[in-house]
Amino acid sequence: MSASLARGMLHKMGGSCCPHHAPTTNPFRMAKLHGNNKSTDYAFEMVCSTLRFGKGVTLEIGYDVRNLGAKKTLLITDKNVQNTIAFKNAEQALKMVNIEYEIFDDVLIEPSEKSMQKAIAFAKSKPFDSFIAVGGGSVIDTTKAAALYASNPEADFLDFVGPPFGKSLQPKNPMLPLIAVPTTAGTGSETTAAAIMDLPEHKCKTGIRLRCIKPYLAVVDPLNVMSMPRNVAIYSGFDVLCHALESYTALPYDQRSPRPARPEVRPVYQGSNPISDVWSREALRIIGQYFRRSVFDPSDEEARTEMLKASSFAGIGFGNAGVHLCHGLSYPISSQAKGCVAHDYPQDKNLIPHGLSVMTTAVADFEFTTAACPDRHLVAAQTLGADIPNNADNEYISRTLCDQLRGFMKDFGVPNGLKGMGFEYSDIDHLTEAASHSVPNIVISPKSTDRDIISKLYEKSLTVY
């Protein structure tokens, strides 16, 4: 199957085949149908990759590629994952059904615009008609970018990047099919429509958030996370925890504004809703029961399997509801990595793993947001395992939930706040400046922020426990 034919088939499978999701000639028609007396949204959507979960399912992906009619596949990974059973099984699966493939293994942990551009250039260099990502969030996000821009070769890099740095345009061509095989219990990227990268010149991170970049298939194999190093398990687990907490406490979808003029411009991050709530709560329950076990005993197969399940579940939750302050404040932290050395990660550069940067401000963030929706913070604390009465006051709820978060950090012995990663009080202005470009525009945050609030949240995060 040629790349152009594959795009054509995907286009026919897209929104235009559904009358309600087809573009309308009048951009205000949908809003008029529901009246003009309300500026917030009135609907939510469930967007998710097909998910296949089970021990050994990596060996099935060759059949999936063959069933797509694909002729030339690009297999993307990083140099560490390339030596794992996950990658070897992925290769074996393709060889079993004689799929032609090539390998790109130059993915950067915590990808940058430059590293993604390198993958994009490779993807454009030959007529690949399908993509497979085997790795953690960095690999999956890089593969999303490679597949998207290879499917839209005339686009500039910032065309699809979200504001304030990019244009957030809709691509002309649908993305060629991507199969994601996660090797960490944390990213959730295998089910989501987002890809994150670093923009060093802005000392911050940004992302692409488009429904079309969600993987065609997520192949979630517990065998692929059994060899996760200790700190990878911790930091990817922190990401799961914050995905679930942020999506569950996000502003409800029907309080988010502005109301979209057309369904195809409804944002990927819609706000909390009844479907995302189910996935986020279940992820929190699993985390409360299995997170510590999965770290303290790497041979605990049940715990690692459950945390991988929580990762995908939280991915479905935040992939539709969204994330807010923890992630928004994390991007300048990881982008401006000081003298932090992350054990169990490549040591060729200063690195603050994404999950650690997200967790660093979590205590301050949820202390700040509790008053906006105390009932949700209460349920979150209870679901994580706290014995807290339903009639608890806001202060008790906030203290209980935040003590749970501190407990994870202390028990795992991670760097204690920003100071533990090499930042000082004098760095707060730089962090605040970088965050102020995007954090105040996070419309699903349960409480609005400004520059002063952002600065105070960073200050409270200098030391956490």
Curated annotation (Swiss-Prot):
A cellular-component GO term for this protein: mitochondrion
Catalysed reactions, semicolon-separated: (S)-3-hydroxybutanoate + 2-oxoglutarate = (R)-2-hydroxyglutarate + acetoacetate; 4-hydroxybutanoate + 2-oxoglutarate = (R)-2-hydroxyglutarate + succinate semialdehyde
Transmembrane segments: none
Intracellular or extracellular location(s): Mitochondrion
Major place of residence: mitochondrion
Domain of life: Eukaryota
Gene3D superfamilies: 3.40.50.1970, Dehydroquinate synthase-like - alpha domain
Top EC category: oxidoreductase
Family matches, as CDD domains: HOT
InterPro entries for the chain: ADH_Fe/GldA (IPR001670), ADH_Fe_C (IPR056798), ADH_Fe_CS (IPR018211), Alcohol_dehydrogenase_Fe (IPR039697), HOT (IPR042157)
Signal peptide span: none
Pfam families (UniProt xref): ADH_Fe_C, Fe-ADH
Database matches in PANTHER family: ALCOHOL DEHYDROGENASE, HYDROXYACID-OXOACID TRANSHYDROGENASE, MITOCHONDRIAL
Summary of the function given for this chain in its UniProt record: Catalyzes the cofactor-independent reversible oxidation of gamma-hydroxybutyrate (GHB) to succinic semialdehyde (SSA) coupled to reduction of 2-ketoglutarate (2-KG) to D-2-hydroxyglutarate (D-2-HG). L-3-hydroxybutyrate (L-3-OHB) is also a substrate for HOT when using 2-KG as hydrogen acceptor, resulting in the formation of D-2-HG.
Family: Belongs to the iron-containing alcohol dehydrogenase family. Hydroxyacid-oxoacid transhydrogenase subfamily.
Name of the protein this chain belongs to: Hydroxyacid-oxoacid transhydrogenase, mitochondrial
Encoding gene, per UniProt annotation: hphd-1
